[in-house]
Regions:
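A beta-strand edge to alpha-helix "cap/lid" segment located at domain peripheries
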Residues: 1-23, 31-129
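ATP/adenylate-binding site constellation spanning eukaryotic-like Ser/Thr protein kinases
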Residues: 27
Length: 129
């Protein structure tokens, strides 16, 4: 599977809350940092989906940059996200930066950060009045 295909499989698993698919795509020692600075493990992430504490209702890809070499890769996704988190509806435009490791011919997320994305520039910025 290509890194692009692995990233799209991860997004699909997130949208579906598919814990088995997420488990297969996350490295056992995966660590993440959320938009609030909180640090979470693979087990924390899987449990949030399994328990329903996090339910992603929309994850719409706006842009995706994929870079890879033989054993590692990085994906940078900007996405519009809507979710139910801890019983409350939340929406945000986020940047997901993921470090992937290739093991046994498959890609696994080793580390991830989620951060608020800058608003896109207005088309008329810098234009003449």
């Amino acid at each position: 599977m290509s890194l692009l295909a692995a990233e799209h499989a991860l997004q699909s698993a997130q949208r579906a809350g598919d814990v088995d698919a997420l488990d297969a795509l996350l490295h056992p020692r995966c660590v993440g940092v959320g938009p609030d600075g909180s640090v979470f493990s693979k087990d924390d992430d899987l449990e949030s989906h399994r328990s329903g504490a996090l339910r992603i209702t929309r994850l719409e890809e706006e842009s995706l940059d994929v870079r890879e070499d033989a054993v590692s890769g990085v994906t940078r996704l900007v996405a519009a996200v809507e979710a139910i988190q801890g019983g409350s509806a939340v929406s945000a435009r986020l940047v997901y930066t993921r470090l992937w490791a290739r093991t046994d011919e498959r890609w696994l997320v080793l580390a991830a950060t989620l951060a608020p994305a800058a608003e896109p520039a207005s088309p008329d910025v810098g234009g003449t009045p």
